[in-house]
């Protein structure tokens, strides 16, 4: 694959006085990653193989049990272009026994990606179709391939790239107080505000358990961003405060020994889900599974790939039925980490 990365940083330090220093920084970065297989699309390998029903010209993927397979690996066709812009401001103010630090960071992420899982199909062949009835360890997966009897298969249909956006804001205030020689206390509070992932054209979806699926009348239906009263984001904006306290002391006025105690609370962030997670309905992942792998294949290669599914865009509550549905947690709950640290530092002779 091809990889290109660029970044630029602009920084200025302003010393207002010996006790007050400000730092201003702005950074921008860009990375572009693309696969070489993307150029194969124009060759239309499925047509050359006589395999009908596929929506990409990439060479299909065939797997035969323990044999070496044919075709590219999954997600071999991709192009991802990511941008990040990060303004940063920090100030340090010394006032007698106090050192106060103020920090603010804003980060804007843009992730533009095209990466179908199996653009020209992923087809698996097993030994059951060529095995003798009731006799174990018979049959051959490659023989099933020669007969064209597909055990199971999947085809990814991604019509458009996904253009994800996410913002992050961070505010930190800390104070380091020298109580007396050999004793220092510190406290800080980190406020973080993180916006959820959005898509430039609202091409996002998730399973909602508060919506009824019309296929069976039970909770669990696909919902779509920007439709039927649903906002552009499928998760809430998270706001959290992360406090930290610490104490360092030199016992018995011994400057060669320092004991440190600290406690901190932090939260993990909701990731910027990449690839095409949470885009069902706008994209499709057609599955083909044998109902009885000893008697009937999912389909025969000579008949072409079945077309018994809705082509995207299919913005319907039932669009994820019968698939491995994507779920974007709408609760806004974040994993919390409580950390206690005790350390002893000793200067050796």
Model-flagged regions — what are they?
Residues 1-349:
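Short acidic-glycine motifs
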């Amino acid at each position: 694959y091809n990889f290109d990365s660029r970044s630029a940083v602009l920084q200025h330090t302003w010393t207002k006085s010996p006790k007050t220093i400000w730092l201003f920084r702005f950074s921008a970065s860009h990375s572009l990653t693309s696969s070489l297989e993307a150029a194969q699309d124009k060759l239309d390998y499925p047509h050359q193989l006589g395999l009908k029903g596929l929506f990409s010209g990439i060479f299909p993927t065939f797997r035969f049990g323990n044999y070496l397979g044919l075709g590219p690996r999954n997600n071999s066709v991709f192009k991802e272009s990511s941008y990040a812009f990060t303004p940063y401001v920090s100030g340090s103010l010394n006032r007698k026994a106090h050192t106060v630090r103020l920090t603010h960071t804003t980060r804007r992420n843009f992730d533009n990606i095209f990466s179908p899982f199996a653009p020209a199909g992923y087809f698996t062949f097993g030994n059951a179709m060529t095995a003798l009835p009731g006799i174990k360890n018979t049959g051959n997966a490659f023989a099933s391939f020669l007969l064209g009897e597909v055990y199971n298969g999947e085809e990814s249909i991604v019509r458009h790239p996904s253009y994800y956006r996410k913002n992050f804001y961070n505010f930190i205030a800390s104070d380091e107080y020298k109580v007396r020689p050999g004793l220092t206390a510190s406290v800080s509070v980190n406020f973080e505000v993180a916006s959820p992932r959005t898509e430039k054209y609202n091409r996002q979806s998730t399973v909602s358990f508060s919506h009824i699926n019309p296929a069976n009348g039970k909770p669990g239906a696909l919902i779509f961003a920007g439709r039927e009263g649903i906002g552009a984001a499928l998760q809430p904006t998270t706001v959290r405060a992360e406090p930290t306290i610490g104490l360092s002391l030199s016992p018995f006025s011994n400057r060669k020994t320092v004991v440190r105690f600290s406690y901190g609370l932090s939260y993990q962030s909701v990731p910027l889900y990449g690839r095409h997670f949470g885009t069902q309905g706008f994209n499709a992942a057609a599955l083909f599974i044998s109902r009885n792998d000893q008697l009937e294949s999912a389909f025969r290669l000579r008949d072409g790939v079945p077309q018994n599914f809705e082509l995207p865009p299919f913005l319907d509550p039932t669009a994820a039925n019968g698939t491995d549905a994507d779920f974007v947690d709408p609760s806004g709950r974040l994993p919390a980490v409580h950390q206690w640290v005790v350390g002893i530092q000793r200067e050796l002779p």
